[in-house]
């Protein structure tokens, strides 16, 4: 697996610097946005443009914008249910597990310094599984296309046989 690249969605530059260095120790590269978008609508396009493998999203973004990190995650989930995301919070969210899936992880900020190695391993595993699932999906799509091609060729062959006869 190539170097994994994440997008850190954070409104405090000091946190960006600390977490970027922390995750670099575990072989993960974190990119960030100098200025957060005014709305959540453009985040998925940013993810595609930057070709990121995972996300780390701060829950509180009020120093730059009016929306919250969980709103960003909801918007991204409308387009992609498999990119791994870590939501950093100051407190536990009651219904987080019910709202989001296997590729979402909630972590309290107070725990990140002691658990960053664990989080990095979770990110690596999830990104590996995502890549594997995408390969299986690509094979499945190719098989469906091949099956359809064979069906069409058989149909054409049958019509040609009818014209001969």
Where are these regions (language model features)?
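Short hydrophobic/Thr-rich beta-strand motif most characteristic of the beta2 strand and flanking loop
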Residues: 27-39
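Conserved phosphotransfer cores of two-component systems
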Residues: 48-50, 75-82
């Amino acid at each position: 697996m190539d170097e994994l690249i994440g997008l850190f969605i954070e409104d405090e530059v000091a946190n960006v610097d600390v977490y970027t260095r922390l995750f670099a120790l575990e072989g993960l590269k974190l990119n960030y946005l100098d200025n957060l978008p005014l709305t959540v609508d453009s985040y998925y396009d940013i993810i595609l443009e930057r070709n990121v493998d995972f996300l780390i999203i701060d829950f509180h973004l009020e120093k730059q914008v009016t929306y919250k990190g969980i709103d960003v995650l909801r918007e991204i989930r409308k387009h992609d249910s498999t990119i791994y995301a870590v939501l950093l919070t100051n407190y536990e969210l009651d219904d987080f597990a019910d709202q989001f899936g296997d590729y979402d992880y909630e972590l309290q900020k107070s725990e990140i310094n002691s658990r960053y190695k664990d989080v990095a391993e979770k990110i690596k595993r999830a990104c590996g599984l995502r890549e594997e699932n995408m390969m299986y999906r690509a094979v499945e799509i190719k098989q469906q296309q091949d099956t359809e091609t064979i069906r069409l060729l058989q149909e054409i062959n049958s019509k040609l046989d009818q014209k001969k006869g």
